[in-house]
Amino acid sequence: DDRKAHYELYRECFQHIYAICRRYYINKDDCMSALNMVYYKIIKNISSYLSKSKDVPFELWTRKIAINYIIDEFRKNSRYKNLIEPTEVSVYENQMLIEDEFENTIDTEQIVEAVEKLPEMNRAVFNLYVIDGYKHEEIGKLLGISSSTSKVHLHRAKKTLRTLIDDVRKNDSISNKILS
């Protein structure tokens, strides 16, 4: 029964595809819409996977479909095209853009909340680079920007995250002093 098989496939894929979609979409309706479109693409292409891609783990195959769908949506939707002036890129080109990762003194939920507050393009580049492991050249091609612009967006994302996380730490410190 196809309906039962589709349901089982949906249950199998839901958690990891939802996690990918949540990283890129703040709005839960947009996230669920993307998740459903990704699921549709998985169903549509499952025969191709079964005949050609059996050597690739299923979760990796579905992850690639999800990320490709999200990137295609970024390309289609012009509101994600935060353009940067060429002079602004050159200021950052000669600086070290990849800074030390955040200390492990803040919990994951606070980091996720901070990432969700980033501007859309900064968040997309941050997710692609830090979470999904893409290189700047690949991100540039995927998003239709230069690798230098990708580096600028990553730099801005990390700088903003540091500020947001520092604010959380200060608030926690103040709360602890008040409660003591």
Residue ranges of each PLM-predicted region?
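A short, charge-rich alpha-helical start-of-domain segment used by transcription regulators
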Residues: 1-19
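Conserved RNAP core-binding helix
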Residues: 7-11, 28-48
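Short, aromatic/basic-enriched loop-to-helix "N-cap" motif that marks the start
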Residues: 46-64
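DNA-recognition helix of helix-turn-helix
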Residues: 71, 122, 137, 141-170
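Internal acidic/polar
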Residues: 72, 80-108, 178
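Short amphipathic alpha-helical boundary/capping segments
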Residues: 110-119
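A short pre-motif secondary-structure segment
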Residues: 125-129
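Short, basic, alpha-helical segments at the C-terminal edge of helix-turn-helix-like DNA-binding modules
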Residues: 166-180
